[in-house]
């Protein structure tokens, strides 16, 4: 567990092949700690961060970049300033240099106040995080499989159930590399084999889902 003032980082999955980091932040404004952390990312990433209109989005983008670098450095022993990333439009970022002995797959997600980042050495990985809040139930017919809709409607905590399903679906489609361009209603995250590859956690008021598929 790591503390930077109001920033908390913890590992919620820690196995030989997979690490998942959760970051929570209560900071409302950009400050000295963010200037400090900016020194750990590339000039290109800083430029991208600065293009965001709102400070909250800039901070989340910075956290996602820093925690990704932290995870890779810890896993590989490569120095931070040696890391080079390829970030194709609308696709998962990859580590383009240096070459590692073991192929790495990683993914991150952020929402208001939190970042989730996952890294795996033997699987493709997709992650998603959402704060539990008032859910947009009017979207269920467009995005939920009938079995998922039944699960939500029969739950005693419908908001939590909605975001459980939503994060599972996001994590799965990110892991598959399709994103949300597919017919989401056709994907049942509660049925095998999909459900066997997804883990979902509640962490500090957030729903976190992690999908891994063996390479």
Across the structure, where does each feature detected by a protein language model lie?
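Core catalytic alpha/beta fold that binds nucleotide/phospho-ligands
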Residues: 11-215
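N-terminal amphipathic/basic-hydrophobic helices that include classical n-h-c signal peptides
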Residues: 1-15
């Amino acid at each position: 567990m790591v503390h930077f003032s109001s920033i908390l980082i913890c590992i919620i999955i820690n196995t030989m092949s997979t690490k998942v980091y959760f970051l929570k932040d209560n900071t409302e404004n950009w400050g000295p700690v963010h200037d400090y952390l900016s020194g750990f990312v590339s000039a290109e990433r800083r430029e991208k961060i600065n293009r965001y209109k709102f400070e909250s989005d800039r901070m989340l983008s910075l956290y996602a970049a820093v925690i990704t670098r932290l995870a890779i450095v810890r896993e590989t022993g490569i120095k931070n300033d040696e890391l080079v990333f390829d970030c194709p439009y609308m696709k998962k970022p990859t580590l383009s240099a240096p070459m590692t002995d073991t192929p790495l797959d990683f993914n991150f997600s952020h929402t208001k106040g939190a970042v989730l980042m996952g890294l795996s050495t033997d699987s493709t990985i997709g992650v998603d995080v959402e704060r539990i809040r008032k859910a947009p139930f009017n979207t269920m017919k467009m995005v939920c499989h009938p079995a998922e809709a039944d699960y939500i409607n029969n739950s005693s905590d419908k908001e939590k159930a909605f975001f459980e399903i939503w994060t599972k679906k996001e994590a799965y489609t990110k892991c598959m590399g399709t994103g949300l361009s597919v017919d989401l209603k056709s994907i049942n995250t509660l049925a095998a084999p999909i459900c066997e590859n997804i883990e979902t956690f509640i962490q500090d008021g957030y729903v976190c889902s992690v999908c891994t598929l063996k390479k």
